[in-house]
């Protein structure tokens, strides 16, 4: 192990030497650039663009382009990038992550690679964690890029499609990660090329890359439509759950006590009914066996009600706003996430718990993970002060290396060892005493909490102590920038949940660094408990001691903290017993304790990484399917020529499936079976007089296929004659294909989503859930393709086309499924199908009619009934 560590350190040193040499080369252009007039410096942009057009690469232009941007920043912003910032900029251009300490000027560092890559004209996306930072950075840095002759756009959720398209067409576009992902999904739901907003994905530079590519990666981006409402069942399950006896997650000391109706696994935060709880459920719902197959839906509602009431904590996992809406709280930033909802009915269960209106469940129409979205960029890089702890994840998932960049000035912050107390009460008493002591000296103090609840508790105690202070949490995030701006002033006391002000500088006020005692110089950061991620702790610490300023950090912990309860509190308690440390005010400083806590954090980080990896593994299964469907959709939308050859392939395969299906159900030499086939053809693709029994009788299977195909071609030609204008024919073809593809694709991914939630149970049967999911999804995909081709054939053949009437296809509304959209002036004949009898067809076999659906979901419904 020491050899591996030594090797990594040596690699970092080699990389830094190389970056140092390259940065010196950029600096060698400084005099030349300084002597240029403003007009001459601005003229460098078109000159560099021309050199790219003539075949020079971006790497060839790096030194000169960086020097141009550096000099322009000095003139426009009054800021001149340091040597270490140039090094960071080179790492970003190379598609990697420079780890730069908080306060080292990451925003300015990004200007150089953004300028260089924007010269290609292919677009650069600068990605931030929220819309406030996107707007701020675009306003501040946009001035520099505009001065240099580049166009800058801002992409926000509130923008119209026209405004979004304009923003994406700029050389540089500022946006949030979620908005980029949703725009990609929406672009693949439109029905006209002119409605698309994004260009091909080229280069993304992600600010706070660990927050976006790691923390947010557990939450897939989903566009959904409404499913049927089940409000009454949520309320009923909630009523039952409130009758149960047991412990809440926030006060649980053990997983289960004798007589409890449910038990909680503290490590995985899962919950299940005990035997006593199951008995109560069966009596409450008046059923014999809760886990009978017929009660599967009920157990789903009960499980969600259990999680909502005993695992999901008010003001920690979510809050209820003044509009009686349940808002999720981001566990890493402390901000609320409007528009985001827990999936699979959990959000509705929380709404029932809080007695607020229950919103309808949703049906997935399009989805993608953050990981798979960003992996589509040709080049991806990002900036953060805390990425080294997630180095393996960046390398394995994104193929990105982390390069630590030295600070411009040495760090002067004093980082004290953790202080551990036996109880929460003793810990908070010590925190308040420390705040009083530092406040009396005029030192600005930033208190970091993990939950809104804790921030309000400390605020209450500070009010009692008559110490003026500000609270920054999910409930007042709109004042975030203003609160953080004043947090460095003399005597300021600020409480922040999960450092919600990340990305906003805390500038020290006059007199703050002049105290005679180093302990009271600069900003004091007080952590009230360790977060489950070491990065979040490091981000909190990093608010102090920026750019070589003095500062101090101190974490206060207790054995009753959530992290300690979940991991390792028994060992720590045993250690305290051995050391004979007892009493409410007992406190311990020990390297062993700190190491124990760090190993607990590593375990949580490992669990979280596994969780993100699993999300990615499931999404990887449908990634290829999504890319194929979206690529084919694009071809249809962008088609300028008649799509008859494509349609003929669909007709041919549909006919083959129908004939082969009937042959499997019973020999087509039998006249009764031929009649069944004829009835199917009349129902799905040919009129009554289009083909007759006598024409099919006595033919071989292949001869039947050829005859039917000839008849279908003739029927298609007569349909197209009603649309004499080639442009109208193309629009009709496009409308039919897109309607069918969108309907079937949304059904497919919703089915995959439901299967993913159930496939995990197969692990109990010693089956690998991922492998099972891959195999099932592949079968479902092939069935979907068959269903698409069948439905397109049916619509093209049976649609009643009104001659000389314009056809217009509209994009599907995001709140509904594509199947609910109407295609103007295209209607399907309502032919009543006669019941067809199929012998020897299994329930789960494909229906012989060729629809691509399982027999039990198609003609088998009547047969099985």
From Swiss-Prot:
UniProt xrefs under CDD domains: DEXDc_SecA (cd17928), SF2_C_secA (cd18803)
InterPro entries: Helicase_ATP-bd, Helicase_C-like, P-loop_NTPase, SEC_C_motif, SecA, SecA_CS, SecA_DEAD, SecA_motor_DEAD
Keyword Transferase: no
Keywords: ATP-binding, Cell membrane, Cytoplasm, Membrane, Metal-binding, Nucleotide-binding, Protein transport, Translocase, Translocation, Transport, Zinc
Amino-acid positions noted as binding Zn(2+) in the UniProt annotation, renumbered to this chain: 847, 849, 858-859
Any GO MF annotation of the entry: protein-exporting ATPase activity
Source organism, top-level taxon: Bacteria
GO CC term, one of those recorded: cytosol
Official protein name in the record: Protein translocase subunit SecA
């Amino acid at each position: 192990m020491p050899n591996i560590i030594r090797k990594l350190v040596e690699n970092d040193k080699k990389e830094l030497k190389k970056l140092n040499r390259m940065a010196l080369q950029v600096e060698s252009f400084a005099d030349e650039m300084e002597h240029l007039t403003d007009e001459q410096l601005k003229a460098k942009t078109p000159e560099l663009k021309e050199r790219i057009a003539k075949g020079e690469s971006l790497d060839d232009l790096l030194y000169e382009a960086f020097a141009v941007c550096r000099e322009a920043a000095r003139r426009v912003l009054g800021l001149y990038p340091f040597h270490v910032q140039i090094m960071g900029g080179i790492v970003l251009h190379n598609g990697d992550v420079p780890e730069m300490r908080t306060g080292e000027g990451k925003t300015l560092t990004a200007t150089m690679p953004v300028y260089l890559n924007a010269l290609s004209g292919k677009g650069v996306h600068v990605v931030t964690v929220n819309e406030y930072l996107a707007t701020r950075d675009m306003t501040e840095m946009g001035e520099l890029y505009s001065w240099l002759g580049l166009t800058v756009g801002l992409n926000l959720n509130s923008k119209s499609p026209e405004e979004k398209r304009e923003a994406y067409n700029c050389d540089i576009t500022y946006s949030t990660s979620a908005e980029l992902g949703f725009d990609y999904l929406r672009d693949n739901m439109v029905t006209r090329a002119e409605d698309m907003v994004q260009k091909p994905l080229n280069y993304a530079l992600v600010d706070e890359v660990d927050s976006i590519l790691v923390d947010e990666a557990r939450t897939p981006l989903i566009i959904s439509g409404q499913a049927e409402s089940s409000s009454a069942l949520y309320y009923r399950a909630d009523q039952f759950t409130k009758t149960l006896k047991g412990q809440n997650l926030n006060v649980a000391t053990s997983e289960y006590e004798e007589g409890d109706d449910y038990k909680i696994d503290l490590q995985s935060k899962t919950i299940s009914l005990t035997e006593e709880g199951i008995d109560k459920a069966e009596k409450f719902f008046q059923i014999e066996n809760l886990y009978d197959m017929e009660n599967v839906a009920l157990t789903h509602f009960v499980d969600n009600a259990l999680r909502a009431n005993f695992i999901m904590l008010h003001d920690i996992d979510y809050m209820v706003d003044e509009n009686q809406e349940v808002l999720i709280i981001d566990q890493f930033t402390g901000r609320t996430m409007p528009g985001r909802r827990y999936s699979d009915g959990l959000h509705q269960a929380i709404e029932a718990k809080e007695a607020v209106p229950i919103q309808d469940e949703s049906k997935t129409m399009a989805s993608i993970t953050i990981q798979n979205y960003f992996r589509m960029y040709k080049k991806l890089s990002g900036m953060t002060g805390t990425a080294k702890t997630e180095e393996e994840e960046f390398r394995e998932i994104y193929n990105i290396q982390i390069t630590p960049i030295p600070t411009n000035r040495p760090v002067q912050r004093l980082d004290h060892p953790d202080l551990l107390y036996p109880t929460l009460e003793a810990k908070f008493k010590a925190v308040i005493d420390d705040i009083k002591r530092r406040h009396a000296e005029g030192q600005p103090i930033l208190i970091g909490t993990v939950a809104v609840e804790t921030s309000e508790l400390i605020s209450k105690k500070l009010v009692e102590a008559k110490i003026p202070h500000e609270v920054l949490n999910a409930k007042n995030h709109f004042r975030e920038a203003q609160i953080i701006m004043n947090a460095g002033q003399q005597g300021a006391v600020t409480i922040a949940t999960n450092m919600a002000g990340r990305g906003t500088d805390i500038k020290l006020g006059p007199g703050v660094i002049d105290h005679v005692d180093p302990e009271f110089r600069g900003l004091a950061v007080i952590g009230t408990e360790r977060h489950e991620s070491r990065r979040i702790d490091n981000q909190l610490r990093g608010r102090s001691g920026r750019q070589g300023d003095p500062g101090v950090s101190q974490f206060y912990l207790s054995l009753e903290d959530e992290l300690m309860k979940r991991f390792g509190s028994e060992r720590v308690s045993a250690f305290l017993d051995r050391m004979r440390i007892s009493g409410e005010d007992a406190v311990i400083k020990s390297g062993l304790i700190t190491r124990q806590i760090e190993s607990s954090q590593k375990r949580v980080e490992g669990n979280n990484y596994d969780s993100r990896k699993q999300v990615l593994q499931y999404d990887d299964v449908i990634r290829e399917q999504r890319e194929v469907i979206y690529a084919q959709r694009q071809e249809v939308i962008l088609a300028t020529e008649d799509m008859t050859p494509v349609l003929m392939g669909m007709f041919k395969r549909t006919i083959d499936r129908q004939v082969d299906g009937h042959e499997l159900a019973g020999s087509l030499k039998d006249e009764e079976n031929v009649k069944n086939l004829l009835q199917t053809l009349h129902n799905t693709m040919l009129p009554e007089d289009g083909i007759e029994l006598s024409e099919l009788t006595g033919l071989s299977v292949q001869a039947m296929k050829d005859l039917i195909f000839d008849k279908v071609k003739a029927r298609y030609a007569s349909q197209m004659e009603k649309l004499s204008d080639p442009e109208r024919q193309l629009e009709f073809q496009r409308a039919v294909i897109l309607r069918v593809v969108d309907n079937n694709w949304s059904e497919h991914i919703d089915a995959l989503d439901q299967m993913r939630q159930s496939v995990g149970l197969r692990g109990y049967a010693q089956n690998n859930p991922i492998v099972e999911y891959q195999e099932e999804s592949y079968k479902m995909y092939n069935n979907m393709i068959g269903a698409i081709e069948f439905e397109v054939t049916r619509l093209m053949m049976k649609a009643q086309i009104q001659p000389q009437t314009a056809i217009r296809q509209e994009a599907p509304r995001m709140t509904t499924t594509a199947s609910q959209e109407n295609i103007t002036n295209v209607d399907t004949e309502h032919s009543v199908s006669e019941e067809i009898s199929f012998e020897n067809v299994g329930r789960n076999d494909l229906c012989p009619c060729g629809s691509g659906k399982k027999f039990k979901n198609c003609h088998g419904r009547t047969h099985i009934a």
